[in-house]
Amino acid sequence: MIELKGVVKRYPGSKVNAVDNVSLQIHNGEFFGLLGPNGAGKSTIIGMLSTLLLLTDGEILIENIPFRRENMDLKRKLSVVTQHYSLRNDMTVWQIMELQARLYGLPKKEWVPRSKELLTFCGLDSECKKIVRRLSGGMKRKLMLARALLTDPSYLILDEPTVGLDPTSRRQIWDLLRILNQQGMTVLLTTHYMDEAQMLCKRIAIVNRGRITRVDSPENLIAGLGSYAVDTFDGVHTSSRFFSEKHDALNYVAE
């Protein structure tokens, strides 16, 4: 289980918290979504889970153990796929996998067959010799996913995994994530697409101005949007204005 307890992040020079007293539990085997607009604090939460950002206050636990940057055993259990393409454009697909294996000290007899398996799973087995800069956006996303899976993590965390992709590529990524979750992997993603969160997630947390305003199943959130006053993504308007119809809620994309 991933647990956040009173997590706070304030950036140097800021007078407000980017993440403000967030407490959350993500259960093993769950597909969980953080839904909110750009600037809501979703990526900051992901940054702290990846240990790239230090907490200002609070605590993160993985399997009831405090999660620290130096705890490599726990870090191996958790892989993060960032929103931006964190790939070297001058390397081939295969070299990207090899570099990841070396960073984690994986023996060749393990990472070579594992890489072949993952690239096939992600539909990239015929692209091994292709330079990254020649890949489409969808292929780059798939490569980042394959790379993240190389260490055989228990927890997969993705920050806006389909942003900027065409509908076909989005569906392909969704299908891969569903399969991984069905195989028992715990998946946490951030998104500002209500349809994406509803389609994939068992539970959704609404994130607004650094706070979690509601956690519920997609069905309950959608059912309540027409009558239950919840904070929407801009933090000003109520559901009666933005979500007067359930259909609108499903197709709403936060600005």
Describe the residue ranges of each PLM region.
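Conserved ABC transporter NBD signature motif
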Residues: 58-69, 73-74
